[in-house]
């Protein structure tokens, strides 16, 4: 089992249990989307000493936690679980890391992104996103979801997509390769 040096920030104890099946890592649980100042202080300390990986559920609450931590603790790494990998096996459950397979968790942790601390460059233009069919049209949402999976950056809406691409400095070559794969699969 692979040992992870950084501390992985997750939402709850069920996420910690599921991670233990996939990797050897220490975790810190936020216990919900309302992160306390004490928890943020712990994350800052851990970032300075060991590094931190934010690995939250692929839903609204998970994204909220991710943004809160990113704003308070610059330079953390991010792992994104594809939405379809976090679907519960039983009806009525919520989307989350606790439902992911060990293989899906290992894949997400193998494709980490680190935020740019200084002002990142915009490498992919608004025009590029329109040309790729990611902002308008009947299949735009589906294409964004698939692009997010391919690039390992999670799902975002059309308004957030340029920000996420810029934040993680996705290179144009990687972006267009992923778009080409989408186009090929649609044919």
Swiss-Prot record:
Pfam families: DUF4093, Toprim. Mg(2+) 1 binds at residues 11, 57. Binds two Mg(2+) per subunit. Its cofactor is Mg(2+). It is found in: Cytoplasm. It is an enzyme of class 3 (hydrolase). SMART domains: TOPRIM (SM00493). The keyword rRNA-binding applies. The keyword rRNA-binding applies. Keywords: Cytoplasm, Endonuclease, Hydrolase, Magnesium, Metal-binding, Nuclease, Ribosome biogenesis, RNA-binding, rRNA processing, rRNA-binding. SUPFAM superfamilies: Toprim domain (SSF110455). Mg(2+) 2 binds at residues 57, 59. Residues 5-88 form the Toprim domain. Required for correct processing of both the 5' and 3' ends of 5S rRNA precursor. Cleaves both sides of a double-stranded region yielding mature 5S rRNA in one step. HAMAP family: RNase_M5 (MF_01469). Belongs to the ribonuclease M5 family. This is Ribonuclease M5.
């Amino acid at each position: 089992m692979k040992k992870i040096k950084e501390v992985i920030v997750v939402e709850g104890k069920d996420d910690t249990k599921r991670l233990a099946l996939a990797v050897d890592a220490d975790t810190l649980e936020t216990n919900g989307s309302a992160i306390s100042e004490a928890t943020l202080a712990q994350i800052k300390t851990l970032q300075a000493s060991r590094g931190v990986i934010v690995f939250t559920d692929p839903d609204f609450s998970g994204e909220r936690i991710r943004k809160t931590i990113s704003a308070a603790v610059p330079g953390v790494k991010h792992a994104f679980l594809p939405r379809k990998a976090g679907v519960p096996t039983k009806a009525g459950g919520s989307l989350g890391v606790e439902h992911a397979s060990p293989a899906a968790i290992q894949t997400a942790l193998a494709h980490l992104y680190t935020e740019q601390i200084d002002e990142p460059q915009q490498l992919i233009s608004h025009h590029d996103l329109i040309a790729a069919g990611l902002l308008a049209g009947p299949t735009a949402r589906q294409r964004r979801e698939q692009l997010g999976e391919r690039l390992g950056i999670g799902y975002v809406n059309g308004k957030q997509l340029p920000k996420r691409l810029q934040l993680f400095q996705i290179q144009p070559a990687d972006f267009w390769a992923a778009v080409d794969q989408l186009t090929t699969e649609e044919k």
